[in-house]
Design a protein with these regions (language model features):
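Conserved Lys-Pro-Asp/Glu-containing loop-to-beta segment of HAD-superfamily phosphomonoesterases
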Residues: 127-160
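Acidic, Mg2+-coordinating phosphoryl-transfer loop and its flanking beta/alpha structural elements
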Residues: 148, 152-190
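Short acidic-hydrophobic, aromatic-tinged amphipathic segments that line or gate anion-handling sites
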Residues: 189-198
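Active-site neighborhood of HAD-like aspartate-dependent phosphohydrolases
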Residues: 2-70
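Substrate-recognition element of Asp-dependent hydrolases with the DxDx(T/V) motif
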Residues: 59-92, 105-118, 163
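A short acidic, helix-capping loop that chelates divalent metal ions and anchors anionic groups
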Residues: 41, 78-82, 117-122, 179-183
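Short, electropositive alpha-helical surface patch
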Residues: 82-101, 122-135, 164-167
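Short helix-capping segments at alpha-helix termini
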Residues: 100-105, 144
């Protein structure tokens, strides 16, 4: 079940300590890769990045002075031997190259290749496997992020629950699995058509908050 609610908030918004924290720490946007930015099941070591329509342009519209941009992705395909780790690394290199050419400053790609039913060394539980918020907590430490003023954009209920557990705003896109995976009951802040609408909606929300 998916419901919509308001926007993210800091405890005590409007108080001097909360406002000081907002100014001293960075806001971030986290995007799942498959089903949000690129087509599902089409990650390969060679060839073009299978961008979803308008996804790269959406990333390019993000003001780097307002948000740091990250990718946080679960890679069960690596865990189950469907994609080699080195091939995923090569894919990420092409992904970052496309972003660089579009002047999109991707700060880091976080990924988790582990699954409790995975193969060999990839078979284990991990705090970085969604819906655990480990990926976001690591980014918070590495980049001094204010997760209470940050957002995650995903296409599964697992993505949304992970964002909620990190205390972030959550935006579900109706591409990829479109929240129909049925893994969890979630209550995203926004439900939108695709990543273009997600970025536009988040930016509108932030402008309204700052006015």
């Amino acid at each position: 079940m998916i419901k919509k609610r308001g926007g993210p908030s800091d405890a005590g918004r409007g108080s001097e300590p909360a406002m000081a924290l907002r100014e001293l720490t960075a806001q971030a946007l986290f995007f799942e890769l498959d089903g949000v930015l690129v087509e599902q099941a089409r990650l390969t070591a060679e060839g073009r990045v299978p961008w979803l329509p308008g996804a790269l342009e959406a990333l390019a519209s993000i003001d780097p002075e307002l948000f740091l941009t990250f990718v946080g992705t679960a890679r069960s395909d690596i865990a189950f031997g469907e994609l080699r780790e080195r091939d995923f690394q090569r894919f990420c290199e092409r992904f970052v190259q496309d972003c660089d050419e579009a002047q999109v400053p991707i700060r880091k790609i976080y990924s988790c290749p582990y699954h409790p039913k995975g193969r060999q060394r990839f078979r284990k539980e991990s705090v970085f496997r969604k819906p655990a918020p480990g990926i976001y907590k690591m980014a918070q430490q590495e980049f001094d992020l204010n997760l209470g003023r940050s957002w995650v954009v995903g296409h599964t209920t697992t993505d949304i629950l992970a964002g909620q557990r990190a205390g972030m705003g959550t935006c579900l896109v109706l591409t990829g699995k479109a929240g129909r995976d049925g893994s969890y009951q979630v209550d995203p802040h926004r439900v939108v058509q695709d990543v273009r609408h997600a970025v536009a909606e988040i930016l509108r929300f932030e402008v309204a908050e700052r006015s």
